[in-house]
Amino acid sequence: MKRAVVVFSGGQDSTTCLAQARHQYDEVHCVTFDYGQRHRAEIDVARALALKLGARAHKVLDVTLLNELAVSSLTRDSIPVPDYEPNADGIPNTFVPGRNILFLTLAAIYAYQVKAEAVITGVCETDFSGYPDCRDEFVKALNHAVNLGMAKDIRFETPLMWIDKAETWALADYWGQLDLVREETLTCYNGIKGDGCGHCAACNLRANGLNHYLSNKAAVMAAMKQKTGLR
Protein backbone atom coordinates (compact mmCIF):
# COMPACT_ATOMS: atom_id res chain seq x y z
CA MET A 1 0.00 0.00 0.00
CA LYS A 2 1.31 3.42 -0.98
CA ARG A 3 0.98 6.03 1.78
CA ALA A 4 1.77 9.75 1.88
CA VAL A 5 1.61 12.57 4.41
CA VAL A 6 0.55 16.03 3.23
CA VAL A 7 1.71 19.12 5.10
CA PHE A 8 -1.72 20.69 5.08
CA SER A 9 -2.71 24.28 5.85
CA GLY A 10 -6.07 24.37 4.09
CA GLY A 11 -4.75 26.92 1.59
CA GLN A 12 -4.76 26.80 -2.19
CA ASP A 13 -1.41 25.07 -2.58
CA SER A 14 -1.69 22.33 0.03
CA THR A 15 -5.31 21.60 -0.92
CA THR A 16 -4.26 21.15 -4.54
CA CYS A 17 -1.50 18.82 -3.35
CA LEU A 18 -4.01 16.83 -1.29
CA ALA A 19 -6.40 16.53 -4.24
CA GLN A 20 -3.58 15.12 -6.37
CA ALA A 21 -2.28 12.82 -3.64
CA ARG A 22 -5.70 11.21 -3.26
CA HIS A 23 -5.35 10.03 -6.87
CA GLN A 24 -1.73 8.93 -6.58
CA TYR A 25 -1.63 7.18 -3.19
CA ASP A 26 -3.76 4.51 -1.57
CA GLU A 27 -3.75 6.23 1.81
CA VAL A 28 -3.18 9.91 2.53
CA HIS A 29 -2.64 11.48 5.95
CA CYS A 30 -2.71 15.22 6.64
CA VAL A 31 -0.70 17.13 9.23
CA THR A 32 -1.64 20.70 10.17
CA PHE A 33 0.34 22.89 12.55
CA ASP A 34 -1.00 25.29 15.17
CA TYR A 35 1.79 27.80 15.78
CA GLY A 36 -0.39 30.63 17.06
CA GLN A 37 -0.62 32.08 13.58
CA ARG A 38 -2.59 35.26 12.89
CA HIS A 39 -4.66 33.39 10.30
CA ARG A 40 -5.53 30.61 12.76
CA ALA A 41 -8.89 30.16 11.04
CA GLU A 42 -6.94 28.04 8.54
CA ILE A 43 -6.92 25.18 11.05
CA ASP A 44 -10.71 24.79 10.99
CA VAL A 45 -10.66 25.14 7.21
CA ALA A 46 -8.01 22.39 7.02
CA ARG A 47 -10.11 20.09 9.21
CA ALA A 48 -13.14 20.49 6.96
CA LEU A 49 -11.18 20.03 3.74
CA ALA A 50 -9.23 16.99 4.94
CA LEU A 51 -12.53 15.31 5.77
CA LYS A 52 -14.17 16.37 2.52
CA LEU A 53 -11.27 15.18 0.36
CA GLY A 54 -11.01 11.82 2.10
CA ALA A 55 -7.80 11.94 4.11
CA ARG A 56 -7.25 8.74 6.08
CA ALA A 57 -6.31 10.77 9.17
CA HIS A 58 -5.75 14.40 10.04
CA LYS A 59 -3.41 15.45 12.84
CA VAL A 60 -3.30 18.99 14.21
CA LEU A 61 -0.02 19.42 16.07
CA ASP A 62 0.64 22.09 18.68
CA VAL A 63 3.88 23.87 17.80
CA THR A 64 3.18 27.16 19.56
CA LEU A 65 6.79 27.20 20.73
CA LEU A 66 7.54 28.47 17.22
CA ASN A 67 5.44 31.54 17.97
CA GLU A 68 7.67 32.39 20.92
CA LEU A 69 10.86 32.10 18.88
CA ALA A 70 9.92 33.38 15.42
CA VAL A 71 8.94 37.05 15.23
CA SER A 72 6.81 37.73 12.15
CA SER A 73 3.64 39.55 11.15
CA LEU A 74 2.04 36.09 11.04
CA THR A 75 2.95 35.42 14.68
CA ARG A 76 2.52 38.90 16.18
CA ASP A 77 -0.71 40.89 16.03
CA SER A 78 1.35 43.99 16.82
CA ILE A 79 3.14 43.71 13.46
CA PRO A 80 0.82 44.62 10.57
CA VAL A 81 0.62 42.41 7.49
CA PRO A 82 1.87 44.61 4.64
CA ASP A 83 -0.17 45.27 1.53
CA TYR A 84 1.19 43.75 -1.65
CA GLU A 85 4.13 45.65 -3.14
CA PRO A 86 5.14 44.40 -6.61
CA ASN A 87 8.72 45.69 -6.40
CA ALA A 88 9.48 44.80 -2.78
CA ASP A 89 12.99 43.46 -2.16
CA GLY A 90 14.35 41.16 0.54
CA ILE A 91 12.57 38.78 2.87
CA PRO A 92 9.05 39.99 3.78
CA ASN A 93 7.90 40.34 7.38
CA THR A 94 5.43 37.50 6.80
CA PHE A 95 8.35 35.05 6.75
CA VAL A 96 8.33 32.79 9.83
CA PRO A 97 11.95 31.68 10.42
CA GLY A 98 12.27 27.92 10.77
CA ARG A 99 8.66 27.15 9.92
CA ASN A 100 9.24 24.74 7.05
CA ILE A 101 12.26 23.23 8.79
CA LEU A 102 9.99 22.31 11.69
CA PHE A 103 6.94 21.36 9.65
CA LEU A 104 8.76 19.04 7.27
CA THR A 105 10.76 17.40 10.05
CA LEU A 106 7.67 16.71 12.15
CA ALA A 107 5.75 15.49 9.11
CA ALA A 108 8.61 13.08 8.37
CA ILE A 109 8.47 11.75 11.94
CA TYR A 110 4.74 11.16 11.50
CA ALA A 111 5.38 9.51 8.12
CA TYR A 112 7.86 7.19 9.82
CA GLN A 113 5.18 6.10 12.29
CA VAL A 114 2.45 5.45 9.71
CA LYS A 115 4.89 3.84 7.24
CA ALA A 116 4.38 6.50 4.58
CA GLU A 117 6.90 6.71 1.77
CA ALA A 118 6.44 10.41 1.02
CA VAL A 119 5.88 13.78 2.66
CA ILE A 120 4.16 16.20 0.27
CA THR A 121 4.48 19.96 0.61
CA GLY A 122 3.08 22.75 -1.55
CA VAL A 123 6.13 25.00 -1.50
CA CYS A 124 7.03 26.62 -4.80
CA GLU A 125 10.19 28.29 -6.02
CA THR A 126 8.50 29.92 -9.01
CA ASP A 127 6.28 32.07 -6.76
CA PHE A 128 8.21 31.66 -3.54
CA SER A 129 7.49 35.18 -2.23
CA GLY A 130 11.03 35.68 -0.97
CA TYR A 131 10.84 32.82 1.55
CA PRO A 132 14.19 30.97 1.66
CA ASP A 133 12.58 27.79 3.01
CA CYS A 134 10.45 27.38 -0.13
CA ARG A 135 13.45 26.77 -2.37
CA ASP A 136 14.15 23.42 -4.01
CA GLU A 137 17.72 23.49 -2.70
CA PHE A 138 16.48 23.78 0.89
CA VAL A 139 13.88 21.00 0.60
CA LYS A 140 16.40 18.58 -0.90
CA ALA A 141 19.01 19.39 1.75
CA LEU A 142 16.55 18.89 4.61
CA ASN A 143 15.25 15.69 3.03
CA HIS A 144 18.78 14.31 2.96
CA ALA A 145 19.41 15.29 6.59
CA VAL A 146 16.12 13.81 7.82
CA ASN A 147 16.73 10.53 6.03
CA LEU A 148 20.21 10.30 7.53
CA GLY A 149 18.86 11.09 10.99
CA MET A 150 16.12 8.46 10.87
CA ALA A 151 17.90 5.86 8.73
CA LYS A 152 14.77 5.80 6.62
CA ASP A 153 14.06 6.70 3.01
CA ILE A 154 11.15 9.15 3.20
CA ARG A 155 10.79 11.22 0.06
CA PHE A 156 9.91 14.92 0.23
CA GLU A 157 7.68 15.64 -2.76
CA THR A 158 7.12 19.17 -4.08
CA PRO A 159 4.57 18.89 -6.90
CA LEU A 160 4.21 22.68 -7.24
CA MET A 161 7.90 23.55 -7.13
CA TRP A 162 8.32 24.54 -10.77
CA ILE A 163 4.82 25.68 -11.73
CA ASP A 164 3.44 29.18 -11.25
CA LYS A 165 0.18 30.17 -9.54
CA ALA A 166 -1.88 30.09 -12.74
CA GLU A 167 -0.63 26.56 -13.39
CA THR A 168 -1.48 25.62 -9.80
CA TRP A 169 -5.06 26.64 -10.53
CA ALA A 170 -4.89 24.50 -13.67
CA LEU A 171 -3.71 21.55 -11.57
CA ALA A 172 -6.67 21.96 -9.20
CA ASP A 173 -8.96 22.07 -12.23
CA TYR A 174 -7.29 18.97 -13.70
CA TRP A 175 -8.27 17.03 -10.57
CA GLY A 176 -11.81 18.46 -10.63
CA GLN A 177 -11.39 20.72 -7.60
CA LEU A 178 -11.22 24.23 -9.06
CA ASP A 179 -14.43 25.45 -7.41
CA LEU A 180 -13.57 23.86 -4.07
CA VAL A 181 -10.12 25.45 -4.03
CA ARG A 182 -11.55 28.79 -5.12
CA GLU A 183 -14.38 28.92 -2.58
CA GLU A 184 -13.34 26.83 0.43
CA THR A 185 -9.60 27.28 0.94
CA LEU A 186 -7.90 29.94 3.05
CA THR A 187 -4.73 31.50 1.67
CA CYS A 188 -5.11 35.04 3.01
CA TYR A 189 -2.61 36.23 5.64
CA ASN A 190 -5.48 38.07 7.33
CA GLY A 191 -7.50 34.86 7.73
CA ILE A 192 -10.31 35.46 5.23
CA LYS A 193 -11.52 32.40 3.31
CA GLY A 194 -12.04 32.29 -0.44
CA ASP A 195 -10.97 35.43 -2.25
CA GLY A 196 -9.49 36.79 1.00
CA CYS A 197 -8.77 40.40 1.92
CA GLY A 198 -7.54 41.30 -1.55
CA HIS A 199 -4.64 43.36 -0.21
CA CYS A 200 -1.93 41.06 1.14
CA ALA A 201 0.73 39.40 -1.00
CA ALA A 202 -0.88 35.96 -0.69
CA CYS A 203 -4.23 37.26 -1.95
CA ASN A 204 -2.59 39.16 -4.80
CA LEU A 205 -0.63 36.14 -5.99
CA ARG A 206 -3.71 33.92 -5.78
CA ALA A 207 -6.00 36.38 -7.61
CA ASN A 208 -3.51 37.17 -10.38
CA GLY A 209 -2.93 33.47 -10.94
CA LEU A 210 -6.65 32.73 -11.11
CA ASN A 211 -7.33 35.59 -13.52
CA HIS A 212 -4.49 34.48 -15.78
CA TYR A 213 -5.72 30.89 -15.77
CA LEU A 214 -9.36 31.78 -16.46
CA SER A 215 -8.38 34.00 -19.40
CA ASN A 216 -5.89 31.51 -20.90
CA LYS A 217 -7.19 28.10 -19.83
CA ALA A 218 -6.00 25.96 -22.71
CA ALA A 219 -2.48 27.39 -22.83
CA VAL A 220 -1.98 27.33 -19.06
CA MET A 221 -3.35 23.79 -18.76
CA ALA A 222 -1.00 22.63 -21.53
CA ALA A 223 1.99 24.28 -19.84
CA MET A 224 1.08 22.69 -16.50
CA LYS A 225 0.81 19.23 -18.05
CA GLN A 226 4.15 19.63 -19.79
CA LYS A 227 5.90 20.65 -16.55
CA THR A 228 4.26 18.00 -14.35
CA GLY A 229 4.19 15.12 -16.81
CA LEU A 230 0.42 14.68 -16.45
CA ARG A 231 -1.60 13.60 -19.46
Curated annotation (Swiss-Prot):
CDD domains: QueC-like. This is 7-cyano-7-deazaguanine synthase. Zn(2+) binds at residues 188, 197, 200, 203. Binds 1 zinc ion per subunit. HAMAP family: QueC (MF_01633). ATP binds at residues 8-18. It is an enzyme of class 6 (ligase). It comes from Salmonella typhimurium (strain LT2 / SGSC1412 / ATCC 700720). Pathway: Purine metabolism; 7-cyano-7-deazaguanine biosynthesis. Disulfide bonds: none annotated. NCBIfam families: 7-cyano-7-deazaguanine synthase QueC (TIGR00364), PRK11106.1 (NF008317).
